[in-house]
Swiss-Prot record:
PANTHER family: ABC TRANSPORTER I FAMILY MEMBER 1. The complex is composed of two ATP-binding proteins (CcmA) and two transmembrane proteins (ccmB). This is Cytochrome c biogenesis ATP-binding export protein CcmA. Part of the ABC transporter complex CcmAB involved in the biogenesis of c-type cytochromes; once thought to export heme, this seems not to be the case, but its exact role is uncertain. Responsible for energy coupling to the transport system. The keyword Cell membrane does not apply. It catalyses: heme b(in) + ATP + H2O = heme b(out) + ADP + phosphate + H(+). GO terms for biological process: cytochrome complex assembly. Residues 9-222 form the ABC transporter domain. Its main location: mitochondrion.
């Protein structure tokens, strides 16, 4: 897929409800291709709910998602996005290499498999020496890096990442920041939640809090 398919993405008056309770309301922001958008907030402020609504994994109670100035259905973005959950979930009894081969076949199609590229993604995340080890033997940080390695195998323009930095030390956070910037330079769009300072100059922050009323957007914070 051409990484400039989405020229602009607008979230308009999105409201999230969980267990008949309003978690957040009237969320509004607009992003251009090449944008990195970071969502911050305390536990319970609705970060994961918002990300899943944008991804089409949860229904929105009101509001619109607008792509290239066109209103779209909730499922429209699924073909253009990659969603990463905050909690790694794997088939634990297979090797790292077999897992990525299986995932790549399922996600990208058999004809698109490049075993060399898969091995390269493991190398870039410092996991090549573990490629024949079972996932069950990995630490939390290693599992998170395995999850991140899938970003290097996807051609999706929109990345939606829920707390991707949990379990990473400073060195791997720096490597991950480089991956994010490279994707943005190619015309990608990233929406992610994190409490960690990435020290990336060009980004936008959305601040959520648990009152469901105060929402602040800060452009080019650093």
């Amino acid at each position: 897929m051409n990484l400039t398919k989405i020229q602009n993405l607008t979230i308009h008056n999105i409201t999230g409800i969980r267990s008949n309770k309003i978690i957040f309301q009237n969320i509004n922001f607009s992003l251009e291709k090449g944008s990195l958008f970071i969502i911050q907030g305390s536990n319970g402020s609705g970060k994961t709910t918002l990300l899943k609504i944008i991804s089409g994994l949860l229904p929105k109670s009101q509001g619109d998602i607008i792509i290239n100035n066109n209103f779209i259905s909730e499922n429209y973005l699924k073909d253009s996005l990659f969603y990463m959950d905050s909690t790694p979930s794997f088939k634990e009894d297979i090797t790292l290499l077999d897992y990525l081969i299986y995932w790549n076949t399922l996600y990208n199609g058999l004809q698109n498999i490049s075993y060399e590229y898969i091995r390269t993604s493991l190398f870039q995340l410092g996991l090549s020496h573990l490629q024949n080890k079972k996932i069950s033997t990995l630490s939390l940080g290693q599992k998170k890096r395995l999850l991140i390695s899938k970003l290097l195998l996807t051609n999706k323009q929109l990345w939606i990442l829920d707390e991707p930095l949990i379990g990473l030390d400073k060195y791997w956070i720096k490597i991950f920041s480089t991956i994010l910037l490279k994707h943005c330079k190619r015309g990608g769009i990233i929406i992610m939640s994190t409490h960690t300072d990435l020290n990336i100059k060009k980004n936008t922050f959305l601040i959520l809090n648990t009152t469901n009323k105060f929402i602040q957007t800060l452009n080019n914070l650093i």
